[in-house]
Amino acid sequence: MDPWISTQPSLSLDLRVGLPATAAVAMVKPKVLVEEDFFHQQPLKKDPEVAALEAELKRMGAENRQLSEMLAAVAAKYEALQSQFSDMVTASANNGGGGGNNQSSTSEGGSVSPSRKRKSESLDDSPPPPPPPHPHAAPHHMHVMPGAAAAGYADQTECTSGEPCKRIREECKPKISKLYVHADPSDLSLVVKDGYQWRKYGQKVTKDNPCPRAYFRCSFAPACPVKKKVQRSAEDNTILVATYEGEHNHGQPPPPLQSAAQNSDGSGKSAGKPPHAPAAAPPAPVVPHRQHEPVVVNGEQQAAAASEMIRRNLAEQMAMTLTRDPSFKAALVTALSGRILELSPTKD
């Protein structure tokens, strides 16, 4: 081996040309391997509010699922009932009778309960409802419009035996009748004297008529459902149109006694005459006493009937007022229980 080769310090090629030794050492950094356990990390701590919101969200989700299931069940039942109803209507329309309706529905496989059969038969055999009553004690200048009452009665009775549901809907509608009364245009009271007692509970102006409309309710009996609307006609201001809704559940109030009216008329006439008028007045006719007895009896009967009606209505109003009071119920229960304990036999 040549001596110049052995004396050569190194054959490595160093690319760090012109750099100091300290800089070269600084550039070399040790590599550190960090192992992280992603599967066994500790869970993060949740905020109590977030946990409460998550629990509430889960509860609402479960409740929504239950409601969805209930809604689906109700919808299925509704569809089944609707299909049964359509089958019954179709069968009744084809046969045109109550008996045919029941036979066809059972022959097609549908089950009809006996109560439903009895209900349909009673609806088919029931007589038509009576026409709405008209006030009989109205003055001679009142005129009942026959068209409205006849139309309402025709609408209620125009129903075939194969459509019981339509008949039920028609019977549920209140009976409507109209009454036309001539009145003074300057009178703003909107009062129609038809023989009944009314209580006004409202008044307003409608779009189709500049005259106001007054609303009344029958006050003769506490449970009477009849209502009345009074308004002047848009074409003629001298006519009052009274619209009645419903039917009275009581008799007509008795009219005032004729004898009292005659006495008041006689006293008014005698008071309005001049001083020389009594000399020219005709003498009173001589009538046997027996002819006056029926008049007195009729007046007494009317007064007794009126007092009995007023007494009965007052008792009904008092009973309704007492039954609505909870303290009265408690007192009644206490009194009855005490009376029962007093009457019950005591054991020695």
From Swiss-Prot:
Q: Which UniProt keywords apply?
A: Coiled coil, DNA-binding, Gibberellin signaling pathway, Nucleus, Plant defense, Repressor, Transcription, Transcription regulation
Comp. bias (Pro residues): 126-136, 275-286
The residues forming a coiled coil are 50-84
Subcellular location per the Swiss-Prot or TrEMBL entry: Nucleus
Which body tissues produce this protein?
A: Highly expressed in aleurone cells. In seeds, predominantly present in the plumule, radicle and scutellum of the embryo. Expressed in roots, stems, young leaves and spikelets.
Q: List the disulfide bonds.
A: none
Extract one GO BP annotation from the record: defense response
What is the predominant subcellular site recorded for this chain? nucleus
Q: Name one GO molecular function term.
A: sequence-specific DNA binding
State the residue spans of region: Transcription repression of gibberellic acid (GA)-induced promoters: 267-348
Q: Which residues bind DNA?
A: 187-253
The motif Nuclear localization signal: which residues?
A: 116-122
Induction entry: Induced by biotic elicitors (e.g. fungal chitin oligosaccharide and fungal cerebroside elicitors) and pathogen infection (e.g. the compatible pathogenic fungus M.grisea race 007, M.grisea crabgrass BR29). Accumulates in response to M.oryzae. Triggered by defense signaling molecules, such as salicylic acid (SA), methyl jasmonate (MeJA), 1-aminocyclo-propane-1-carboxylic acid (ACC), wounding and pathogen infection (e.g. X.oryzae). Repressed by gibberellic acid (GA) (at protein level). Induced by abscisic acid (ABA) in aleurone cells, roots and leaves.
Question: What InterPro entries does this protein's entry cite?
Answer: WRKY_dom, WRKY_dom_sf, WRKY_plant
Among SUPFAM superfamilies, the record links this protein to: WRKY DNA-binding domain
Comp. bias regions, Low complexity: 102-114
Q: Name one GO cellular component term.
A: nucleus
Free-text function comment from the UniProt entry: Transcription repressor. Interacts specifically with the W box (5'-(T)TGAC[CT]-3'), a frequently occurring elicitor-responsive cis-acting element. Represses specifically gibberellic acid (GA)-induced promoters in aleurone cells, probably by interfering with GAM1. Regulates, probably indirectly, the activation of defense-related genes such as GF14E during defense response. Modulates plant innate immunity against X.oryzae pv. oryzae (Xoo). Confers resistance to the virulent bacterial pathogen X.oryzae pv.
This protein's domain notes: The WRKY domain (213-266) is required to bind DNA. The C-terminal region (267-348) is required for the repressing activity on gibberellic acid (GA)-induced promoters.
Oligomeric form and interacting partners: Interacts with WRKY51; this interaction promotes W box binding of the complex WRKY51/WRKY71 in a zinc ion-dependent manner.
Stated family: Belongs to the WRKY group II-a family.
Query: PANTHER family from the entry?
Result: WRKY TRANSCRIPTION FACTOR 36-RELATED, WRKY TRANSCRIPTION FACTOR WRKY71
Q: What is this protein called?
A: WRKY transcription factor WRKY71
Organism this protein belongs to: Oryza sativa subsp. indica
Q: What is the lineage of its organism?
A: Eukaryota, Viridiplantae, Streptophyta, Embryophyta, Tracheophyta
Gene, per the UniProt record:
WRKY71
